[in-house]
């Protein structure tokens, strides 16, 4: 199955999305390897983890965006900037699409390793941040 959204597909450029149906919220990520989805890391599972991180952050901060799109009613929007979009989209846009600058590995708090994430927009810092 190939998912399409405008000029991107799950085979090229579309890494994931989130939405809702009748008050049930979901996030979807594609397996990102080669031309599939996005490639920010050298291991496909890391691309998937960073994509899931992006989508889960957005489903938390802007859960009803699909309702806003369906109805044209902005009151459904949560954390959303008319100039840049959702909390995970702004860093990608600000980087000029350079995924390597916003999808990074961060150290775990207990020092046992690192985990791939996408930096989210921070209003406090006016820049992408990991927390």
Provide a role label for each language-model segment.
Residues 1-131:
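N-terminal pro-sequences and low-complexity stem/linker regions of secreted or lumenal proteins
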């Amino acid at each position: 199955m190939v998912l399409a959204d405008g000029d991107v597909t799950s085979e090229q450029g579309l890494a994931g999305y989130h939405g809702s149906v009748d008050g049930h919220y979901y996030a979807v990520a594609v397996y990102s390897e080669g031309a599939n989805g996005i490639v920010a890391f050298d291991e496909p599972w890391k691309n998937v983890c960073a994509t899931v991180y992006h989508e889960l952050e957005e489903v938390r901060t802007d859960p009803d965006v699909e309702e806003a799109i369906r109805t044209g009613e902005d009151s459904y929007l949560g954390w959303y900037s008319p100039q840049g979009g959702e909390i995970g989209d702004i860093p990608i846009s600000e980087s000029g699409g350079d995924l390597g600058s916003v999808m990074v590995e961060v150290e775990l708090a207990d020092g046992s390793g690192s985990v791939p994430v996408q930096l989210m927009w921070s209003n406090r810092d006016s820049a992408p941040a990991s927390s």
